[in-house]
From Swiss-Prot:
Upper lineage: Eukaryota, Metazoa, Chordata, Craniata, Vertebrata
Keyword presence, RNA-binding: no
Keywords linked to the UniProt accession: Antiviral defense, Cytokine, Disulfide bond, Glycoprotein, Secreted, Signal
Organism this protein belongs to: Canis lupus familiaris (Dog)
Highest taxon listed in the record's lineage: Eukaryota
Xref: Pfam families: Interferon (PF00143)
Stated name of the protein: Interferon alpha-1/2
Amino acid sequence: MALPCSFSVALVLLSCHSLCCLACHLPDTHGLRNWRVLTLLGQMRRLSAGSCDHYTNDFAFPKELFDGQRLQEAQALSVVHVMTQKVFHLFCPDTSSAPWNMTLLEELCSGLSEQLDDLEACPLQEAGLAETPLMHEDSTLRTYFQRISLYLQDRNHSPCAWEMVRAEIGRSFFSSTILQERIRRRK
């Protein structure tokens, strides 16, 4: 299903310059890749939300990590890195049981991999992360993704369970995009 035009335009505007201005000077293409990941997640939708009503779940997304008010640039960069890493490991294992179109899945995994390369090339010490312990933020995100993994296991990786996870990851990745834009605007 195609995203509404105004939503797509908003994603482009928010993502184009989202991380390029953080302390580590990520490439301009990083924000575009973020938009592409969101688009691919939307295109991967295979089931209508109504057909999976009995699968709804509150994964307790840690919104407080993405409000942009508490985090410094280096902390935001770390949160974005952990988030991207966890999404990659969720959708891109060597043997995926997900019911996705393989072409879309491969493109998603490629985009996430490129984003991780950008983030891992950023020297975190220069960004000030060496002085800023992020144990709580890291643990909170890991717990969130653990809940998602357990949900998939409990639901036997069914197509409806994957649809709920895809929608959840789309919302959380959008929050990551908003965080990146807020940090960029502070500069």
